[in-house]
Every structure is written in structure tokens, then in C-alpha cells.
Amino acid sequence: MKKYLMAFLLFANLCCDAQQAGKHVEIPPMPNGKVWKDTKGNPINAHGGGLLAHNGIYYWFGEIKKGKTWLVPDQQWEDYRVPAGGVSCYSSEDMHTWKYEGIALPSVTGNAKHDLDTSKVIERPKVIYNKRTKKFVMWMHVDANDYSYSQAGVAVSDKPAGPYTYLGSVKPNGQMSRDITLYKDDDEKAYIIYASESNKTMQVCLLSDDYLSPTTSYTRITSAINREAPAVFKYNKKYYLITSDCTGWSPNPATFAVADSLLGEWTQGGDPCTGTGAETTFQSQSTYVLPMPGQPNTFLFMADRWNKTNLEDSRYIWLPLQMVNGKPVIKWVDK
Ligand code: GAL
């Protein structure tokens, strides 16, 4: 018995040393909806996020949700909030073992006029790389607690994991900008895609060559229903846009739209999710879609399973998205 205990203690000690030295440690597969941990064993805190693939490394950026959740009084919807915690970054070579890189863009304390003050909203950060300027550019949704500010914020860095320097925020072409994503096309042109006009339209706006400001080229995607949580990808020269309905932190069905050009006509396509749970996007909300390297028909669909009364405890749902007869199909898998 004593021998086994000694062996166990030695093993536990080795694991601990490996973690402290930042070496590879065995991490269980990422079970959807369970707490996911980084290489140090801490819960991954990167919500409403996106991935950047750069020089063989994946960087995961997301909202830091930390602290007590409270309900903003006198709102028309369940406006649950935590202090705006800035943007975190994790890195991985295998999309499975995630190393915490630190806070890529910190929030600001005690300056209520600043976009990044902890009293505000910093959501859905995404990062792309500009080959010409050699800068990493982050766009995000910045807002007031009641969502009346509705602006797109931009930050820049020389290194993928940051730190990022905040440059300010805009209403692109005078248009409201809430839930946002960022897309870089094969021709190096980049676009922001954001919920606008009180979520009645999604808009796509071409960015300047340095990716730091919106141009006047933009399009309004209208549909019968309000949309949020945009995620864009390209397949066989067509563009696909997955969005959610607008029910705050509560899940709802996803839909997709398809277009021949990002600024072109978008056609509504229906619900990409199928099987039990499809009607709530498997209790989650879209945030990003990443092409899987070496698997031309397969994408990674990233979504958030929000815990509205304890936002810090929100979870991640990553599912395979398969293109079948020109349509995206998302099915549940356990991990
Ligand atoms: C969601 C939106 C989230 C967050 C939330 C607040 O629908 O997609 O990013 O803003 O509303 O209620």
C-alpha cells in the first residue's frame, strides 16, 4: 500500500513540475459544455472569441468574464453583466492544449469615459494579420451597459499575443455596430461584419488597406428576423454567414446566409444545425468558424453556451461543420 502511495505521490509531483515548467501535460479531450482548462489547469476564460492561425500556432482571443454577474436595472431585456475584463489570449499548436498567453488587451479601471472601462461592454474580439503593415489587428464590440453606444473598437499589436494598443472606436459610416466579426479574404482584403440598426440588419464593411478603419464600401443584409453573433467563412468561392436570433444570453436557432461576394447580395439559407438540440444551436450561440487545415469540406464551428446568471461560468461548444451539397451542416458531438 505504502509503495503505491509513494508511486502516486511521485507521479503527482512530476505532473506538477511539468505544469510549472510549462511543458506539455496530458489534458483530457475537450468535452463540449464542460469546463475547459489551460496547460496550468485554470479554466479557459475566452468567451465570444475567435481564432487566428499564424506560423503554425493557433491563437484564441476572447472576452474575459470575471466577477459577480449583476442585472442592469430598467432594461427591456435580461441585461446581465460582469465587469468588462478585457481580451485574453491562449495559444496552441494542436487546438487542444491551450497555453495562457495573458491579457492581450486590458480593460481600464476608474475612467468611465474610456471605451474599455470595466463599467462598459467589451465583446466578441477577433484578430487578423496584415501582411503589408506586419501588424496584428483586433476588432471588437464596445458599448455602454444599455447598448446605446454601439461602436466597433480597434486595437493593434506587433505580436500575435499582444499586448494590443487600443486606437479607439467608430460607428462605421455612421451605422450602429454591435455583435461583430472580422474576415480576411484570400486577396488580403478584410471586412468587419456587425449587427446594426438595432440588430435589424447585419452589415458588411470593407476595411482600409491597413485594416484600421472602415471604408465607405458597405452593404446592409436585410432579413425578416433580427440577427446577432455573426461568423463568416468561405467555401468553393461562396461566402457563408452564420448568425443567431436576438434573445440576449438565451440560446435560439441559428441561420445561415450565402453570397457570391461579401458586399454582394445575400440569400437566406435556413438552419445549419441538425438533430436533437438544433432548435437552440445545441444550447449555444455562434462566435467563429475556422477552416480545418487539410480537410477541405470541414470547418470548426465555435459557439458559447452562456450562463446568464453566472457569466464567468459560461462554457464553450466546438462542433464540426461539414459542407454537404453546398450547405453547412452542424451536428452535435460530445467532444
Ligand atoms: C447576445 C450577444 C452577446 C451579448 C448578449 C447580451 O445576444 O450576442 O454577445 O451582447 O446579447 O445580452
Annotate the PLM regions:
Residues 1-22:
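Bacterial Sec-dependent N-terminal signal peptides
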Residues 19-335:
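Carbohydrate-active catalytic/glycan-binding domains of CAZyme proteins
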